[in-house]
Amino acid sequence: MKISGTGSAHPSKIVTNDMLTQLFDTSDEWITTRTGIKERRVISSEYLVDLAVEAARKALDDAKMNAEDLDFIICSNVVNEYVTPAMSCMIQSAIGAKCPCMDLNGACVGFIYCLDIAEAYYKIGRVKNVLVVSAEEPSGMLNWHDRTCSVLFGDGAGAAVLTPGDNIKATRLSASPACDRLCERRELQYTPFNTKTDVNMPLVMHGQDVFKFATNAAIKDLSALLTTLNISANDIDTFLIHQANLRIIKSIQDYLEQPKEKFPVIIHKYGNTSSASLPMLLDELNREGKLKSGDMLALSAFGAGFVSGACILEW
């Protein structure tokens, strides 16, 4: 398949590092030095599904496609406002599509999971046109008095329309069990039979463990795909790395011995938007005219699980 259109949407509320100093002991310098983040967008009056729908419509417009022509909608999200129905079904209803829908939770790797599934369905002749949407609201998972996590995340949505083609050259998905290193326990409703007392807790993250895993996993995934395709990092025009932490991106860049210009970032203004970060970055590059036909792109992401994934595609 090939990506024929992109879109993104962001909440209107901007939360700067200076604003966070009113909530806990931190500073703009402390946050920027450790993460590269200056501000993030946080949902206030909006609903996440509205951002998802906006991103989807922009992607369809960019692809010059009607929603009725879609064969499949896949949506990645960690936290949906509704337990049911799936967010993909709500997107389908809003845009007027009539195709099957599916949600998945691949943590921050969700967008690459969606690309891989779309490509697999295309190869067996099940679909021609697929809408992929990643919509995330990490702000609702945080303890906003804990600076270790709340400085990192922002909300947003990104989307891509995939159409027939052979532009997705290779993908790789992997998992390494370490579920207690980055997790949030869901709040459950009372039942007369549930004897558990620890039914809810905010997001917990062991930062150093996550940093090591993310860096090593991205390097391993990207190196494996380059070997599979018998190409080198020099053949990649742009590396799109999950916008989790600027130091992680820099570590990957240093290992691959590639120039900074090949690693565009939006983390400084959006923070870590989980699985939405890659399609949001892709859309910004697309709309700014920074991607040329024939460019080779390498996407890499990593997240809770631990899970990781990478994809090399031609623009």
Task: Report the location of each language-model feature.
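Buried hydrophobic positions in well-ordered alpha/beta secondary-structure cores of metabolic enzymes
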Residues: 3-5, 31, 59, 70-73, ...
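Flexible, glycine-rich active-site loops centered on histidine and acidic residues
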Residues: 127-157
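A contiguous, well-structured pocket-lining segment that forms one wall/lid of small-molecule binding clefts
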Residues: 198-267
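Condensing-enzyme catalytic core mediating Claisen C-C bond formation in acyl metabolism
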Residues: 1-45, 146-212, 216, 220, ...
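Conserved beta-ketoacyl condensing-enzyme motif
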Residues: 3-5, 46-106, 225-249, 253-255
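Acidic, glycine-rich active-site loops and adjacent beta-strand->loop/helix elements
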Residues: 9, 76-82, 108-110, 134-139, ...
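Catalytic phosphate/nucleotide-handling subdomain of diverse soluble enzymes
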Residues: 283-300, 306-315
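Conserved catalytic cysteine-centered active-site region
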Residues: 32-34, 38-50, 77-130, 254-281
